[in-house]
Amino acid sequence: MKISIGVREIAYFLYASGDLSQDFFSNASARDGIMAHQYLQHKYKAEDKKEYFIKSDIKINDYELELSGRIDGVLKEGVEIVLEEIKSTRLKLEDIDIDYHREHLAQLKLYGYMYCDAEDLPSIKLRLTYINTRTYDTTYFDLLITKDELKEFYYDSLEKYIDWINVLEEKRKDRIDTIKTIHFPYDKIRDGQRDMMKASYYTLSHKNILYAIAPTGIGKTMATIFSGLKSMKHDREKLFYLTGKSTGKKVAEESLRLLIDKGLKVKALSLTSKAKSCLNDTPVCDPAKCIYAKGYFDRLQQALVYAYNSYNLFTPDVIRELAKEYNICPFEFSLDLSELCDVIICDYNYVFDPKAHLIRYFDDSLYKPKLLIDEAHNLVSRARDMYSAEIRFNSIINLYNLLKDKGHLIYEDILRLEDMLKGYERLMIDQNIYYQPLFDNNIYDIFRVIREKVELILQNDEHIDNRNEIAVIYFDIVGFLNIADIYSEAHRFIVEEDNSDYNIKITCLDAREYTYNIIKNKVEGCVLFSATLYPINYYMELITKGDGKYINLKSPFNPSNLKILIDANVSTKYKDREKTIDDIIDDSNVVLNTNKGNYIIFFPSYKYMELFLEKFKNDEYQIIAQESDLSEEKRIQIFEAFKDTKTPHLGLFVLGGSFSEGMDFIGDLLKGVIIVGVGLPQVNLINNLEKDYFDNLFGQGFDYAYTYPGFTKVIQAAGRVIRSESDRGIVILIDERYLYNIYKVLMPEHWQNKKYIESPFDLKDDLVSFFNGGDNNG
């Protein structure tokens, strides 16, 4: 049996040692490491070779092993050949010796034998070089070693690794066999679900891009996961299920649990954030202060082997328990464990965010990831946020204070920064804000200098007070500089004056270049799905630059079970709200009094909701108004309150908030929703900058910045009503703009049972007819 293995895999599995240091804790480290590598390699002579690909085939037991890797440098020094392995670090070089991380030297020795064998050399010089990513200072360790010594190490390593290969191969056979034979876990495949599975399977098998408009009830989670698994044919393929909400993760976990219970033998892992997974009261990513970072690599192999042999589904709770048992960092353990898994459930940022994406999968050709992107309509705004950055001037002042006696080192830099910001303040015409299309490189230089000085302070003083607080601001600066490094025509540089503070922003108006690059060039097939991809061309353009195909699946639910009643006689525009609030109250009371039960009214803003509350009276309902700083715990409490059938509840929520999606009000939990307005985002500088940007690009600035994002929120809110085949309910849309043709065109196909009403009397008649089971076709 032929098996392909990376040399680095063998070295790290067998010989990894030491602590989790700052070198392992951020993508900034990895990016800086790449630049440091390139700096050294750029100094190579013409006859030297960099990133030298080497491959070796060897038969051991029943396995034909294909080992491969890239040697950082093959150098000629006189008549001597030197193999160089470069490792970057933030540590002081005097603290590093040749055994700093044993896996580094092991990797180099494996390369050494492969090169000697290929070139028939009796001996060779190995050079392990460490470069500091801040100063670019280097230290190196040379080892002159014979081919025979390397051969002994090489074969000894492979003999040890074969035991692990035996375990992996047994699980691999089980995975391949059960993926082939596993049947769909439900007796019945829903309407639309089969079409979605066929399209998803074809897309992932042919490395294409698919958008699926999949209404509620199709069973899109199981459809995509099942077809995604069926499309997996090779060892290095990994299926990523991306979702932005904890509820979405739970559904994906349960779908995989069901398949595993039915006999599927795959390894699946649900990844959660470092902050949520940390076993300490406060995250302290420092081996001097964290027992889970100290000696992490010394205990990692044992933990990996036990976990892999004992579990199929690694939920966050399972990972935390394993981490406690082996005294290792749960977050880093989950990342290392993910390399042994077939399916990874995670947030969008682990794929798309330059500050957090998983480098091991998306910057390395070793793996072949496939993407399933749930609630893909959220990716547009999420990606813009990922490629934006901001930092407050007061944070830099706070950094100065936290550094105490070392604060003077950045004092002059702070003064320079303050002078520049005051200059921008003088340019502000109104709204205390200034923007320009070009980034200010002088501000970049100041932040870069501050970053370098703080990094040096942290390196040289391991026991500095306020280390964690300093590190938080330090990484904010690092993140800001990283976004500045990829500043483009789609970014705007903004300075905002706010209560004697300055907010310095890099705002991304359009992230499609970045999302498309990842989907097109870093993965092998992508399915994006949501019930609210309207209009589809908007989402395709802003995620994959129009590339890909789409399917529009029919709702599995009887469209007559959802009644859409539209009151287009009321203006909800800002200037008219005081005048028309009584009309909204009248419509609301008609709905609430005609058929008592739980209802939700969605408003465009908290201020509009408060205006309604001031005048609204209805003693028969328990009113629950959403708070602006709603916690997850409070959100669940509100959801649970709707299950109390003794008293009807009226929820007053904000469009686009946590109650607009991801909450399943099944059965009698919700009779209907009233949606006030068309969901337009607030008119502000950022949205107007987007409008101007897309006007120049497509000539549809207002629609791209306001209309489409707004109506997506309307569709999401309306989607709370029908969550199962037996549900019946109503949606009331209130706004004169629903008469506009653009909104009529945007309405989903399953909104067939809709009617425009003339007055509250018409509204009552239609409601009575619907709830009594009368003519539902308007």
Where would I find each of the regions flagged by the language model?
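Walker A/P-loop
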Residues: 205-227
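A substrate-engagement module of RecA-like helicase motors
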Residues: 176-177, 183, 236-344, 352, ...
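A contiguous, basic/glycine-rich beta-loop/short-helix subdomain that forms a polymer-engagement track
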Residues: 319-344, 355-362, 456-571, 579-580, ...
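Conserved RecA-like P-loop NTPase helicase motor core
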Residues: 568-579, 628-739
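Signature of the SF2 helicase/ATPase Hel1-core->accessory helical subdomain module
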Residues: 224, 250, 254, 326-343, ...
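Metal-dependent nuclease catalytic cores that hydrolyze phosphodiester bonds in DNA/RNA
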Residues: 1-80
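Mg2+/Mn2+-dependent nuclease catalytic core
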Residues: 56-152
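Conserved pre-motif I regulatory segment
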Residues: 171-213
